[in-house]
Amino acid sequence: VYPNGLGNPSGWDNGIGTANPHTADDVGFLTALMDKVSRNHKIDQRRIFFCGFSAGAIMSYRMGASLGDRIAAIGIASGTVGFTLPNGQVATIPQPVRPLPVIAFHGKKDTHIYYNGGGLRANDLSVADSIRFWLNADNCDSTPQVTTLQNGNVTRDGYHKCKQGADVVLYSFANGTHEFPSLQNNDNFSATDAMWEFFVRHPMP
């Protein structure tokens, strides 16, 4: 199911983004969408997953945190869990309702949501900050199992000692930009396949 964020500017009410929370309730919208699809189709309720790119990635982070009692795992491409406000306060997605498996992908040359934080539109939290957010939520050992692929161009950090088997996995792309990793772009890596393999191993406990 492929919902799309609308508005001007287009986006999602992800709790940290551009949508107006007084006119948009996208957590409610996506919850209603799950309900409708479940009524109209035979859905395995233990295998409902969310994934997204950029603003959709941030919305998937938000849904995983808020609806973890219904969502089994999330997949993230070029997202962040929050940003630093001008007054120095940090705005993030809500604290997750349960330990949640997360797989994330991010290019180190992303010029929209910077890998190391900052960025064009706001002082986004870094990829390391976002992963740390989930390591804390999932009560994971902070030492990853590191694997390099494609002659060192892709690095996989796997955190597998987590509460309730809620693994956290990060793929970093040395030459990756603000894009969904695929076999058709510079990453030469299928995030779709990696995400699905992760989802298959992580149904709702």
For the regions a protein language model found, what residue spans apply to each?
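Alpha/beta-hydrolase-fold serine-hydrolase catalytic core, especially in secreted/extracellular enzymes
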Residues: 100, 135-205
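Short catalytic/ligand-binding loop motif for oxyanion handling, primarily in non-cytosolic enzymes
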Residues: 9-11, 83, 111-114, 179-181
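Structured segments of extracytoplasmic/periplasmic soluble domains
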Residues: 33-40, 51, 63-70, 77, ...
